[in-house]
Design a protein with these regions (language model features):
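Chitinase-like catalytic core of GlcNAc-active glycosidases
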Residues: 5-195
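Solvent-exposed serine/threonine-rich low-complexity stretches and specific carbohydrate-binding patches
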Residues: 96-97, 430-443
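Substrate-binding cleft of secreted/luminal carbohydrate-active enzymes
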Residues: 210, 215-363
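Short carbohydrate-recognition loop motifs
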Residues: 362-391
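Extra-cytoplasmic beta-strand recognition segments
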Residues: 379, 391-419, 450-452, 467
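Extracellular beta-strand ligand-recognition surfaces/modules
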Residues: 409, 447-473
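Short, surface-exposed beta-strand/strand-loop-strand elements in extracellular ectodomains
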Residues: 417-429
Length: 473
């Protein structure tokens, strides 16, 4: 189900992102301020690399648990960081030699890295090797040690992704294991399918093994159209991209002057974070906040080339439209706390399309932190309804309905009777849809709760969840 003509599925995005202002100041359970952030457009990502580590603060850094949870609920891999910096930034070859230590014929730190990832529930490691001191053959054997024990324990998704500032794939490294990948130097996005025979894999598998680097921290969050054109042209994908620290431009620029001040909470923080979410939208979707828009000339947004991913394939599925950030804490529509907060671990799966509204005509969708049913935010749709239907596609799904079930919609509206639920039973933009009717309706703390019986869909598959906003005049 394509939102625009230039979308394809094959190419992947690896997001090497900062998640905290500094490596050593990383709260495990969020904090009571309004400045925290992590990406919310997981539908355009395949892997998350926690970009952290420094010679003075630590070089082995597991990803935050909440971020791993948020990534996993959208089907995105989460990788920690082993950071061997260049000597100019304090890197030491002796650290690499220690990592490659063998005892009784085994790479003991490869085993330990697996044990850490297994215990903490993430999917492997990004090894930034710019210090030198190790040979290709040693790293190949190190990776084989890591994945050998992972495979033996059933963790076949475990991955090591390597980076050493090389502009072309290290064939021996990438061939180490079926899950091994490489982040190539900045300026290297291209079509790498011709490496399939060399790597002993299919062309389709090259997309998950070779990523062309894009230094977004320098180019800006909308400054790498050329990289998209090289790897993901409008007529089909040839390669994948690794984005280096887009959050520096999307988020950190907005909040860095507020960190550690009284403005970590309150109006200045709200203003800064509104800017963050606009910038995030501009990069992942486009400046119009509309994935149906295809710009063949300017910045197309990632949605202009990437087909949205979804893992929603069974019941129950629940979302509160929470971005992991709040001015208040809500429980069933009741405001129970007025302290600013953030916590990445309570982030909801946000809509697959942000936002795809047919017959839009001035309707605007935004994240509302002032009113919510649960957690800290809701979606607010604002504007005047013109006559007719205004279909808002929310979630791409593949949910088989075998024994009924219930769809529960919690909402507020100033126009009674204007909201209905439509479910697509074909995976087509213009495919068959079922409009749900006769809900059981209750009210709680000012919110309408509509519950729809799904037994009429038995034997069918739900491919999309949408809302239709309608008006007779």
């Amino acid at each position: 189900m394509k939102a625009n003509k230039n979308q394809f599925y094959e190419g992947q995005i690896c997001n090497a992102t900062i998640l905290f202002p500094t490596c050593s100041m990383c709260p495990s359970q969020g904090a009571n301020n309004f400045l925290g952030y992590q990406p919310t457009y997981w539908q355009y990502m395949d892997k998350l690399v926690y970009w952290a580590g420094s010679a003075s603060e630590g070089i082995i850094i597991p990803p935050p648990a909440g971020s791993t949870d948020a990534a996993h609920q959208s089907g995105v891999k989460s990788l920690g960081q082993v950071f061997f910096p260049p000597s100019a930034f304090g890197g030491r070859q002796e650290w690499v030699r220690q990592m490659l230590t063998k005892e009784n014929g085994k790479y003991i730190y490869a085993i330990k890295l697996y044990e850490i990832a297994k215990y903490m529930g993430f999917d492997g490691w990004f090894i930034n090797e710019e210090s030198g001191g190790g040979s290709t053959s040693e790293w190949v054997d190190f990776i084989k040690e890591f994945n050998g024990i992972a495979d033996a324990n059933g963790d076949t998704q475990m991955e090591i992704q390597g980076y050493n500032a090389a502009r072309s794939p290290n064939e021996a490294i990438v061939k180490s294991h079926k899950s091994t990948s490489q982040f190539l130097e900045y300026g290297s996005p291209d079509d790498y399918r011709n490496y399939a025979d060399i790597l002993g894999c299919t062309e389709a598998e090259t997309f998950s093994k070779i990523y062309g680097g894009v230094q977004v921290v320098n180019s800006g969050h909308m400054g790498y159209t050329d990289a998209l054109d090289w790897a993901m042209p409008v007529d089909g994908h040839g390669g994948s991209l690794a984005l280096f620290c887009p959050e520096e431009r999307i988020w950190k620029d907005n909040v860095k002057s507020l960190l550690g001040t009284k403005d970590e909470c309150g109006e200045n923080a709200y203003l800064a974070q509104r800017k963050t979410f606009y910038k995030e939208r501009d990069m992942w979707v486009n400046q119009y906040g509309d994935p149906t828009y295809a710009d063949d000339f300017g910045w197309p947004g990632l949605s202009g080339r990437m087909l949205e991913r979804s893992v929603i394939s069974s019941m129950p599925f629940e979302t509160s439209f929470c971005v992991g950030l709040g001015k208040h804490r809500f429980v069933e529509g009741e405001k129970q706390n007025t302290q600013d907060w953030y916590h990445s671990g309570v982030q909801s799966i946000m809509p697959t399309w942000r936002y795809w509204i047919e017959n839009k005509e001035g309707l605007d969708v935004s994240i509302d932190w002032d009113d919510a049913y649960n957690f800290g935010s809701s979606l607010k749709i604002k504007g005047k309804l013109t006559a007719g239907d205004h279909l808002m596609r929310l979630y791409k799904t593949m949910i088989p309905v075998t024994s009924g079930g219930t769809l529960r919609l919690v909402y507020k509206t100033s126009t009674p009777g204007s909201v209905e639920v439509r479910l697509a039973t074909e995976s087509k933009v213009k495919g068959e849809m079922v409009t749900l009717s006769n809900p059981t309706v209750t009210d709680k703390n000012g919110w309408t709760i509509a519950e729809y019986d799904l037994s009429q869909l038995n034997g069918k598959t739900v491919y999309m969840i949408s809302l239709n906003m309608k008006s007779e005049t």
